[in-house]
């Protein structure tokens, strides 16, 4: 047990969350991540479960979780088709 004047032991950079990492530690934190296919799949799976449990699987739910997914879909589809839409917008005659 730590006494009153002692600081708690520092958390290793690998175990820190992204928002807890300082800018000087960021390159070493990124290099410690798992970029294998299973590591990337696990990261997406954790993100999905976090989103699902926070917005979809709640006692008193609302439409906000589904609305965010639809808004992201609209933004991504617009960003992918923007190059095509930009050229059509600049044409004088269709």
From Swiss-Prot:
Transmembrane segments: 68-85
Superkingdom: Eukaryota
Membrane topology: Single-pass membrane protein
Predominant place of localization: mitochondrion
InterPro entries to which the protein is assigned, alphabetical: F1F0-ATPsyn_F_prd
Record-listed N-acetylalanine modification sites: 2
Function per UniProt: Subunit f, of the mitochondrial membrane ATP synthase complex (F(1)F(0) ATP synthase or Complex V) that produces ATP from ADP in the presence of a proton gradient across the membrane which is generated by electron transport complexes of the respiratory chain. ATP synthase complex consist of a soluble F(1) head domain - the catalytic core - and a membrane F(1) domain - the membrane proton channel. These two domains are linked by a central stalk rotating inside the F(1) region and a stationary peripheral stalk.
Protein name per Swiss-Prot or TrEMBL: ATP synthase F(0) complex subunit f, mitochondrial
Organism: Pongo abelii (Sumatran orangutan)
């Amino acid at each position: 047990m730590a006494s009153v004047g002692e600081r708690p032991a520092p958390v290793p950079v690998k175990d820190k969350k992204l928002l807890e990492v300082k800018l000087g530690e960021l390159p070493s934190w990124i290099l410690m991540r798992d970029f294998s296919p299973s590591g990337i799949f696990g990261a997406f799976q954790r993100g999905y479960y976090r989103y699902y449990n926070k917005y979809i699987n709640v006692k008193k739910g609302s439409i906000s979780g589904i609305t965010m997914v639809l808004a992201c879909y609209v933004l991504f589809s617009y960003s992918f088709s923007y190059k095509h839409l930009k050229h059509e917008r600049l044409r004088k005659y269709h």
